[in-house]
Amino acid sequence: MQLYPAIDMKDGKCVRLTKGLFDNITVYSDTPADMAKLWVSQGATFLHLVDLDGALAGHSVNAPAIREVLSLVSVPVQLGGGIRSAEDVKAMLDLGISRCIIGTKAAERPEFMRELVEAFGPERIVAGVDAKDGMAAVAGWEKTSSMTALELCMKMKEYGVRHIVYTDISRDGTLTGPNIPYTRMLAEKTGLNVIASGGVSSMEDLETLSENRIPGVIIGKALYEKRISLPDAVARFQ
């Protein structure tokens, strides 16, 4: 199971939100690059970066912080937040990002994902499927679409997407445990590389995800609140 330590950026700082609410923010570090170095030194082999300002603005906002992270670590980095066009994807890949996560645009115009996969290849493009009560959410989680998360995932598969980051918004940043039944259902029904996100709080959660053969998991607040030791998690599950 691939572990992805999360680094969420807002105003150039490393932060965590609770349930995706922008008025519920905790700042963990003034320098995202320092967090990236720390996680890599503790065994991280892939990092998950989120440009929260970008998610709201609809374009990349934290490029200097992203550039600094990439200059200091040698492991692959996936990035989400504010990537809404092929030009955005190209700019981020040119910076050195390994995989771009497309969220809002994937739900609003799924066929756009086919264009991206054809242009950049399936290993470079990830669909960010964010769900609220089973419905796909868009625009920095401020709105829900008319599609279920499963319908969106099946559409993504049809268009050549191989990687999905599935986030249960109601659990994100809450440390209440991930939505394992739904995540497992998505992985089994789609056959895609489903990366679980939202609510992971303990080694027990990782154990359950691993037992359910979930291919990957993003760990955020649990690392920052020291509920999960990354070296221990890497040794046990990766």
Model-derived features: positions:
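Catalytic cores of alpha/beta
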Residues: 73, 77-99, 181-216
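N-terminal beta-alpha supersecondary unit
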Residues: 14-60
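Short, acidic/polar
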Residues: 28-40, 84-90, 145-155, 206
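Short secondary-structure boundary segments
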Residues: 7, 51, 104-105, 129-131, ...
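Active-site-adjacent beta->alpha loops and helix N-cap segments on the catalytic face
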Residues: 3, 54-70, 84-90, 104-126, ...
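Conserved anion-binding
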Residues: 11-12, 18-23, 90-93, 97-172
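Conserved, mostly hydrophobic/aromatic
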Residues: 8, 39, 47, 92, ...
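Structural preference for beta-strand elements that scaffold enzyme active sites
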Residues: 2-6, 46, 74-78, 98-101, ...
